[in-house]
A protein has these predicted regions:
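Preference for long, amphipathic alpha-helical scaffolds in soluble/luminal domains
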Residues: 1-365
Length: 365
């Protein structure tokens, strides 16, 4: 079977899987976690559920997918993204300023810039009527930015209720770490760029320059909250392209191209579906055709009969980092997240093969 012929059925199954999951708000992508009460966490010993961040990223990826094709499927994916944007809007915090917290019922966990960036980007692209909800969180985040122009990951508003502010600051000091994280800032500035690139031009320009300066000598970007360098580098490289830092973007792409495993995919120790999908989407238009074919063949080999891909490590938390000594690394993965990245990657390859590709054409190729 030719590459063109293989893409259509795989894309069709992946899209159907994501549409079905999206009808219920992507429940498989809800991150569930318990925190130990012995560590002094008030919200410990009960299960906390993150229902906003990963589904918002998935919905944004569906907008990417729709942008890469036309036809009925693209319209359905935009509708799924729109419904998810409505869910995100309803989940905005009401007990403290700052927007969204990854685990909203955990008192020690502040609202965060990554969740805010995901909300901004999704609202801007799928449901602009919700953009007024993010005006105040953006103001707070930018007001607390470092001299470099990069905001800190945790958004603790000066006018938050005193008790809540005390708990959040304690959580940051002892558990989460008070950091500026390039990959988180990249998502935030990509969100501002999608929302209003003219209005936020000075802030985006300063932030992008600082992120370009944070690039490692080899071309990759470090990531605090994601496993391995692939996703953080992809986010930062996307911002570099959007803001005209072409040399930094090309260095990042070149570094990822060199990091491919002999099997044809990407991953920290071996090729895995998630990293392969992320890298392939970024490099689909620049890799040699034979390298694209190997990566696609590998990615397709991982697809499940129901159209999904098995999850591989995505989000990470380094336990002890806040106190200067990482004791262990907790990771989380999701089949639905991996499938959304894989769908985007396959569509990027299909677009390279046929710039006028539609899902209907892919299915009959």
């Amino acid at each position: 079977m030719s590459l063109r012929a293989a893409l259509g059925p795989a894309i069709d199954r992946a899209g159907a899987f994501l549409e079905a999951e999206g009808a219920a708000g992507f429940p498989e992508a809800h991150h569930r976690m318990r925190f130990p009460r012995w560590a002094g966490i008030v919200g410990g010993s009960v299960e906390h559920v993150a229902e906003v961040f990963a589904p918002a990223v998935i919905a944004d990826l569906l907008v990417d997918a729709a942008d890469l094709c036309e036809g009925a499927a693209a319209a359905r994916w935009r509708a799924v993204a729109r419904r998810q944007a409505d869910r995100v809007a309803r989940a905005r915090l009401t007990d403290r300023p700052g927007g969204w917290s990854y685990f909203p019922d955990l008192p020690e966990l502040p609202p965060d810039l990554d969740s805010l960036g995901a909300a901004i980007r999704l609202f801007a692209r799928a449901a602009p009527e919700h953009l007024p909800l993010i005006e105040d969180p953006i103001r707070i985040a930018l007001a607390g930015a470092e001299p470099s122009g990069l905001p800190r990951t945790w958004i603790i508003a000066p006018d938050a209720p005193p008790k809540a502010r005390k708990r959040m600051r304690r959580g940051v000091r002892w558990h989460w770490g008070d950091t500026v994280d390039p990959e988180v800032c990249a998502r935030f500035f990509l969100g501002l760029h999608a929302m209003d690139a003219v209005r936020f031009a000075p802030e985006i320009a300063r932030g992008a320059a600082a992120i370009a300066a944070a690039q490692a000598p080899g071309g990759l970007w470090p990531a605090t909250w994601y496993a391995g360098p692939v996703y953080g580098t992809a986010l930062c490289a996307e911002l570099m392209v959007a803001t005209g830092h072409i040399r930094a973007a090309e260095a990042g792409r070149a570094a990822l191209a060199k990091a491919v495993h002999p099997a044809g995919g990407w991953g920290m120790w071996e090729a895995v579906p998630l990293d392969t999908a992320i890298a392939l989407a970024l490099l689909a238009d620049s890799l040699p055709p034979e390298a694209v074919a190997r990566a696609v063949e590998l990615l397709l080999s991982y697809q499940n009969p129901d159209g999904s891909w098995p999850g591989t490590q995505w989000i990470q938390m380094e336990v002890g980092r806040a106190l200067g000594r990482v004791r262990r690394r907790i990771t989380w993965q999701s089949d639905t997240v991996t499938t959304a990245f894989a769908l985007r990657a396959l569509l990027a390859v299909a677009r390279r093969i046929d710039p006028d590709m539609t899902i209907e054409k892919a299915e009959t190729a």
